[in-house]
Regions:
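N-terminal secretory signal peptides that target proteins for export/translocation
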Residues: 1-16
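N-terminal targeting/docking segments
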Residues: 11-15, 34, 108
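Bacterial N-terminal signal peptides
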Residues: 18-33
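Long, charged/polar, soluble alpha-helical segments
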Residues: 38-165
Length: 165
């Protein structure tokens, strides 16, 4: 029975090239995914810039939803920056989130289009930012709390507008 437990020398030799190929495949996969992370960040920056451009040129009725999309994307970006430990960049991103939240507030008076979609997006964004609140401390926590307060206010205003129409 011990012959069943011991692999024969033929078996080991036969699988050795497969191990090398598997190792090579794993190594090449790792090497290819590292630049993909940098490319993904660059792509998301480009998409965000395009969204900002589209929002700046959109009609006042459409801007509310586009700004909500920008706030959502920037909050996700800030969450990733917080998770990566880049709190200074996250604080700058959250300042931009505050700016766009104020723009949403100002555009509500223009009979905004897709109010319910914008409200749902801001609600999800607020929830995500509340999760990020537990990852920061000190002065960074105050920045996140201020942004969260601003988004809560915008969400309440959006809800009021949704139920008014």
């Amino acid at each position: 029975m011990s012959f069943l437990l011991r692999p024969s020398s033929r078996t080991v030799i036969r699988f050795r090239p497969a191990l090398h190929l598997a190792s090579l495949g794993l190594l090449s996969t790792l090497c290819l995914t590292l630049p993909a992370h940098a490319t993904a960040a660059s792509d998301s920056q480009q998409a965000l810039a395009q969204l900002e451009e589209r929002a700046s040129q959109a009609s006042p009725r459409e801007q509310c939803f586009l700004y909500a999309q920008i706030v959502h994307a920037m909050t996700e970006q800030a969450g990733q920056q917080i998770a990566d430990g880049d709190t200074e960049q996250a604080a700058a991103t959250l300042q931009q989130v505050n700016r766009y939240a104020r723009l949403i507030h100002l555009n509500l008076a223009h009979n905004a289009k897709r109010l319910k979609d914008a409200e749902e997006l801001i609600h999800n964004t607020t929830y995500r930012l509340a999760e990020c609140l537990h990852l920061v401390s000190g002065p960074d926590k105050a920045t996140v709390q201020d942004t969260l307060k601003q988004l809560d206010q915008v969400n309440d205003e959006l809800l009021t507008q949704v139920f008014a129409h």
